[in-house]
Amino acid sequence: MSKLKKRTFAALLLIVLTTLFSCELNSEDGRWDPMKWTSDRPGDPRKITATAEGGTYQLKCTNYGGPWISSVAAPDTTIFGSSKEQDFRHIKYDWYDVLAKENTFYITLLPNTTGKERKLSIVVTAGDIFDYVEVTQK
């Protein structure tokens, strides 16, 4: 066998062995603990039922550092935190204002004078983990 064939064979063998042994079958990638939330209100912190008078509601993520806003959706519009007009830590539009400050989210709703129920869906992320906050204003 010539030197070139031996080197080519050795290089291919090295590539095959590296490929076989470089990945683990029990890798933890993609297996993230769900976000955990606390609030000063009773019930599920991710489900907010607001009065027609509006107000500010706050919830805190206790197991991830510095989560941010991915998007905020109302029935007529969706705003992404990555858009130029907004910021992934603060989205303000029409009747709502969502602010992420460190691990705490402040959701401020203006008074609902429409007489109709309003809904808001907030997608929160901390990288590869996502969670949802649903807001219903009477």
Regions found by a protein language model. Give the residues of each.
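Beta-strand secondary-structure signal
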Residues: 58-60, 104-108, 121-123, 132-134
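Bacterial Sec-dependent N-terminal signal peptides
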Residues: 7, 17-45
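C-terminal edge beta-strand
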Residues: 128-138
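Short, solvent-exposed, Trp/other aromatic-anchored flexible loops in extracytoplasmic proteins
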Residues: 102-116
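A short beta-strand micro-motif common to beta-rich folds, especially ectodomain repeats
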Residues: 114-128
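Short, solvent-exposed loop/linker segments at the N-terminal edge
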Residues: 48-53
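Surface-exposed binding patches on compact interaction domains or structured appendages
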Residues: 41-43, 54-106
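Bacterial N-terminal signal peptides that target proteins for export
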Residues: 2-10
